[in-house]
Amino acid sequence: MRAIYITGYMGAGKTTIGKALSKELGIDVIDTDQKIEEKQGRVIRDIFAKEGERSFRQYESEMLCSLPTKDVIITTGGGIVERIENREWMKENGTVVYLYCDPYVIADRLHEDITRPLFQKENVEAFVAKFEERRAFYEEAVIQIDTTNKSIQEVTEEILRRINS
């Protein structure tokens, strides 16, 4: 089975759905952000603070291309779609799934989460604007699922149905 790449904005449920799919399919799930943190020896928030977003995006591209492309689910960081080479890599090497969630619902979910470097709780409009900048990139995915107000099971079952059709 080709890799399943799960994309979407921060807080859309990529990690949660990736774990649920992993359990259903009996294959590993790899989180690109977690792998970057392991390789760099620090959390993403610190990479952004010390090296900036551009360096982080380079680490992200390198990590993406180093991961397996068979029998694996890869949950990506929300900004991985900003680079065309990343979008092309995922399309060529697997099935790309976009998890959409209303950005205002996400903002409510993330209000207290300090681990999100691009989320500024005092500026929800900037958060939504960043989502809109990326939206067309996300929508290049072959499978697009609205997770707003859906359970983990509903989303997982929908992905499985669409992958197997």
Curated annotation (Swiss-Prot):
One of its GO terms (biological process) is chorismate biosynthetic process. ATP binds at G11, A12, G13, K14, T15, T16, R116. The keyword Kinase applies. It comes from Bacillus cytotoxicus (strain DSM 22905 / CIP 110041 / 391-98 / NVH 391-98). Belongs to the shikimate kinase family. Its EC number is 2.7.1.71. PANTHER family: SHIKIMATE KINASE, SHIKIMATE KINASE 1, CHLOROPLASTIC. It comes from the Bacteria. Mg(2+) binds at T15. This is Shikimate kinase. Its cofactor is Mg(2+). GO terms for cellular component: cytosol. It is found in: Cytoplasm. Binds 1 Mg(2+) ion per subunit. Its main location: cytoplasm.
